[in-house]
Amino acid sequence: MSMTRQEIQDLCVKSLEEKMVGTTDKGIANGNGFYQYFFTNFPDLRVYFKGAEKFTAEDVKKSERFDKQGQRILLACHLIANVFTNEEVFKAYVRETINRHRIYKMDPALWMAFFTVFTGYLESTGSLNDQQKAAWMALGKEFNAECQVHLKNSNLPYVH
């Protein structure tokens, strides 16, 4: 099933209604919960979190660092979902995200892999249906495509 940019945006935004950012306990827990899920289900990727390579979900839950990091990742997801219909702004945000992450020397394949992780998190909390998952993966495909173009144009490793 092919979806329009507007349909993708609407479905992604809807999937985030229960995953709002914010300073309330629930808002903080939403973001921290992503990293609890991440550290439990993708332990091999902990290497990208200097000083937290051996963290468990319980360590993450008690970590102010991941309270803040969780807010950043959720905010980023809200932003890309909400600007998806504005293709130039979406692409600019993708490029800016790459620029901020250059120092971590991430495997370029991880940009698409993120959306598998993120949709897995949403599914694990009951916040995602099949249509919304398809929308996130479609958004992720476009996100990744712009990532790879920008990585290539920046003379950085990219997925061919």
Curated annotation (Swiss-Prot):
Binding-site positions, heme: H101
One GO term describing the cellular component: cytoplasm
Cytoplasm recorded as keyword: yes
Domain Globin: 2-152
GO molecular function list: heme binding; iron ion binding; oxygen binding; oxygen carrier activity
Coiled-coil segments: none
PROSITE patterns, sorted: GLOBIN
Compartments where found: Cytoplasm
Chief place where the protein resides: cytoplasm
Entry keywords, A to Z: Cytoplasm, Heme, Iron, Metal-binding, Oxygen transport, Transport
Role description: May be a globin and may play a role in oxygen transport.
Family statement drawn from the similarity comment of this UniProt entry: Belongs to the globin family.
Record-given protein name: Globin-like protein
Source organism of the structure: Caenorhabditis briggsae
